[in-house]
Amino acid sequence: MKGLNLAEWAIRHKQIVYFFIIAIITGGLWSYFHLGRSEDPDFTIRQAVVTAAWPGASAQQITQQVTDPLEKKLQDTKGLDYIKSFTHDGKTVIYVNLKDSVPKEEIQTRWHEIRNLVNDEWGSLPSGVMGPYINDRFDDVYGSIYAITGDGFSYEEKRKYAENIRRRLTGVEDVQKVELLGVQKQEIYVEMDQNKLASFGMRPSDVFAMLQQQGAMMPAGMIHTDSRNVAVRVEGLLDTVESLKELPIHVGERSFHLGDVATVTQMYADPETSLMYFNGKPAVGIAVSMAPGGNNLVLGKNLEKEIEKEKAELPAGLDIEQVADQPSVVNDSIHEFTKSLLEAIVIVMAASFLSLGFWSGIVLALCIPVVVCASFIYMKWQGIDLHIVSLGTLIVSLGLLVDDAIIVIEMMQVKLEEGMDRLAAAQAAYKGCAKPMLAGTLITAAGFIPVGFAAGQTAEYVGAFFWVIASTLLLSWVASIFVSPVLGYRFIRVKAGEKKSAFADRAYRLFYKAIAWCIRFKKTVIIGTAAIFAGTVALIPFVNQEFFPDSVRPEIILDVNLPSGASIKETKEVMAGIADNLYGDNRVSSFSTYVGDSAPRFILLFDPLAPEDSHGQMILVARDSKVRDSLRDDTLAFIAEQYPDARAHARLITTGPPAEYPIMLRLSGKNVEDTAKFAKEAAALVSQYPGMKNVSMDWPEETPVVRLKIDQDKVRKLGGDNYSISRDLYVKLSGYKVAESYQGNQLVPISFRLEGSNAARLADLSSLPVHVGNGRYVPLGEIADISYENETSTIWRRDLHPTITIRGEAGGDKTADSVVNELYDRTLKEFREHLPDGYTLEKDGAIENSEKSVQYLAAPVPIMIFLILMILMFELDKIPLMVIAGITGPLGLIGAILSLFLTRQPMGFVSIVGMLALSGMVVRNSIILLDQIRQHLADGKKPYDAVIESAALRFRPIMLSSVTDVLGFVPLIPSPFWRPLAVSFIGGLLLATAIGLLVVPALYCWYYKVEGPKAS
C-alpha cells in the first residue's frame, strides 16, 4: 500500500494502540458475559396450522366438504410453498407451509392473510363444523417443563396447584408463556333410565330444553339512576352439581327435582384426552417458553428460585419434578464449546511458540484475545447469541484469524534476521504484506458468502457462520496491521549480529529442489494435478451423504402407533406396559409419556405430531449418550415382542431441521384407491432393499364402521327424521352435550345420557330402542338396515392430491441420505417410470430439505466467484495471474473428499460449506505467492529466480498458517455437527497448500514460458 504506512503510525502512537487493546478486551469480556445463550440458533418455522372439526363426519366426507374447500382457498396465500393436510374421522388438520424465500419480517403478514382467507370460506362450510381455528405460533419452544405428581391426589387437585404455579411463573423475568399439559377435563353427566323417562311421558329433548334454558347466560339489563348505573344479576346458574340436582322439573301437574329422577355426577371426561405421565406416574405438566431475546441461563436460575418457593408450599406427597431443562442443557453445551474454544487457543499458541520461537509466539499469543474479544463485541452488537453455530464458528475462525498475524510476525522476523532495525522491519512487513493480506482476507471471507446469503431454513440455522467468521477475519486483518507491529516492535528479539538466510536449513533446500523439479516438468505436474482432481471428484458418489447428523443429546423420541381406530384406553395400556419395562433400568435417567398427543416443542429441532387417540409418545432420557443406542434398540425389541400390533419408531434429536423418519418417500395421485395401491407396491420394493428396517406407510389400514341405511318412509310415518335418530343414538352411545356449568375459571360441559347405554355392544345394536317421535321407541333394526364395513379413516393430502408417505430406517454402514438416493435412482427407477400420468413418487423428509438447501446454497455461488475474481483482478492486475490464482481454488476438494472418504465421514451441509470456504483459503495462498513473484520481478530478479525464491520465501508463512489453521480445527472433531467440516478442512487445506505451493509456480512458468537451468 502506498502512502501512509499504518504499521509505522501504530508504532509511533503506541499509547493509542494500547488504549484500544485494553478497551477491546474489557468490552469483549463484558459482551461475552452478556451475550444470549441457547443450544441452537433460532430459525423461522414458516408453517401455520389450520384445524376444524365436524363431529360424525367420515374422513371422506370431511375431506370433500371441509378440507378441500379450505385448501383451495389457502392456495391463494402469497409465497405458498405447499399445503399438507391430515384428515381423520370428524376432524382435519391443514399445515400451510410458506416458501423459504419469504422474509421472516413478512411472516406475520402472511398469517394475517391466511386468517382472512379462512374467514372468507367459513360461511360456506357445512353447519355443525367447529372452527376453522388457526395456530400461527407453531414454533413456540417450551424448553422448561415440570410435572406435578403425587399418589392420592386427583387430576383436579393437581390441576389447581398447577394453575396457581402457572400464574406465578408467568411473572418471572424472560418467561413468555406458560401452558398446562395432561389436564383432564371434567364433565357433568345427567343419566336417566330410559324406562323411567318414558313413564313420565318425557322425551330426551324435554330434558335438553330445561337444562339449556337454566344454564344459559343472559343479561338482565341495567338500571340507570342519576348518579350511577346498576347492573342486575340473576342468580341460579348451574355452577355446581347440587344446583343441577335441585333443578325443578315440571311434567303436567307433577313437579320434582332433577336429582329425584336422574343420577347427576361430575367426573373426568370419558374417554380421556391427552394424558401425561412422568416416570410412569400420572402428571399434570407445566410448560414454560422463553421470551424472544431472553437468556436461557438467566431464565433457568429465575425458574429454579420460583420453583423452590412453590415446592415449600405444596402439601406432603405432592411433588414438582423437572421433565425438560433446556437452560441446563444450554449451560452444558456452552461449557463444552467454550472448553473447545480454549483448547483451540492453547493449541494455536503452542504451535506458534514452537514454530516462531518464544518472543514471536508471545506476540501472536497476545493478538488472539484481542481479536476474539473484538468478535464478542461484534456479536453483542448484532444480537448473535452463543450457541452451537456461533461458538463453533469462533473455533473455526481461530485458526484463520492468526494467519495474517503470522505473516506479519514472520516477515518482521525475517527482516530483523537480515539486519534491519525493528521499525524498518515493521515498515517492510506492512509494505510487503498489507495489501495481499487484505485481498486474501476478503477472498477467504467471500468463500463463506453462500452461507450468509442463501435462502432457506437450513441457511438461516447456520447463517451466523458467515457473519461471525467474516467479521473475525476482517478484525484479524486490522489487528495484524495495528497490533502485531506494535507488539512485534516491543517483543521480537534477534541476537546481535545474527543474520541468516531464509533458505539455510534443510527443509528449504528440499523444497527448493521440489520447486525446481516442478518447473522443469511443469506440463507433467499440471496434467497430473488435473488427473488427481478428476479422480477425486469421481469418488463423490462413494462418499456417504448425510446433511445433518444426529446430536449427542441423550433423548430418545419413541413414537408408538396402534392400529387406526384404537381407543385411547388401549393406547394408555400399551404405553403403561412400556413404562413398566423401563423401571429399574439403570440406563434410564427419566422418561415422560404422552398418550393421545405429542410432547410440546421442547427444543426448536423437534416437531410435535398431531393429536391422535391411537398414538403415544415417550421422551426417554438416557443416562448418557453411550448407552442411548442400546436403550433404544432394547426398547424397540421389547415392543415388537410384547405388542406385535403396535408400530414403534425411535428417533434421535438431529443437529439440523428435523424429519419424522430418516428415510421418507411420498407418492401422490389422483384418487385414494389407486394412490394406496401404488404406495403398497413402492413400499414392497423399499422393503427389499438390503438392511431396510421398520418400513411403513402413514396411511393406516381401513377401520370398521357400522353403516345405517334408514328407511325414510317408515321413519317419517312414525314422526321421526334422520336428525332425531342420530341425536338419540348419540345420547345412548356417547352422551349429548346440552349445557355448561360455570365453575370459577373452568367451563364444565353438561352431558345427558341414558344409564348403561355407554356399554352397548355391536351385537345388541339392532335391538337398541330409538326414539322416533311422539314418545314412541322402536328397535333400531326395524327402521334401518345395519351393515358392517371397513372404510378409510385417515386421508393425507399434499397440494389437493391424496398423498402417502413411505417411511423406514437404514441398517448397516450407509447413511439414510445415501440409502434414499439409491432407492430413488436405482431400486424405484423403473417403478417411477411406469407410473401413470398424474401419479408421482418424490423424495420427502430430510433428503428433500437437504437438496433444497444445497440449491439455496448454490444460488449465491456465482456472486461469490465474481467477487473473488474481482478482488484477484484488483490485487494482481493481470488476467493471466487472476486465472492462475482462480483455478487453484478447487484444489481443496482433493484433500477434502479423500479425507471424508477415508474416515467414512458423511458429506453434508457443513462439509459443503467447508469445501466452498477452502477455495477462498487456497486462492488466498496463491495471491501471497504471486504477489511475491511480482515484487521480486520489480526488484530486478530474473523470472526463474523470482519464482523459485518467492516460493521458498513464502513456504514458511504459508505452511505455518495452514498448519495452525489445521490444529485449530482439532477441538471440533468430537462434535458430530462440526466433525465433517473439521475433517474436510484438515485434509483439504493440508493437501491443497502442499499442492498449491508446487502447482502455482508450475502454472506461472508454463504460461509465461519461464525455463530453468538445463542441468539441475
What role is predicted for each listed range?
Residues M1-R37, C433, K499-F548, L665:
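Signature of alpha-helical transmembrane segments and their immediate interfacial
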Residues L4-L6, Q61-R137, N195-A216, L237, ...:
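Solvent-exposed, membrane-proximal periplasmic/extracellular interface segments of envelope transport
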Residues W9, T51, W122, R168-V346, ...:
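Extracytoplasmic/periplasmic membrane-proximal domains and adjacent transmembrane bundles
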Residues Q15-I16, A23-A57, N119-G128, K380, ...:
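Transmembrane helices with small-residue packing motifs
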Residues F19, S58-Q65, V102-H112, Y142-Y146, ...:
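Solvent-exposed, non-transmembrane alpha-helical starts
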Residues W30-H34, V346-Q413, S471, L867-R954, ...:
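Hydrophobic transmembrane alpha-helices and their membrane-interface caps
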Residues V323, V330, I334, I409, ...:
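Helix-loop junctions and hydrophobic alpha-helical segments within the transmembrane domains
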Residues L398-M412, A434-F453, E460-K499, M618, ...:
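Transmembrane alpha-helices and their membrane-interface boundaries in multi-pass membrane transporters
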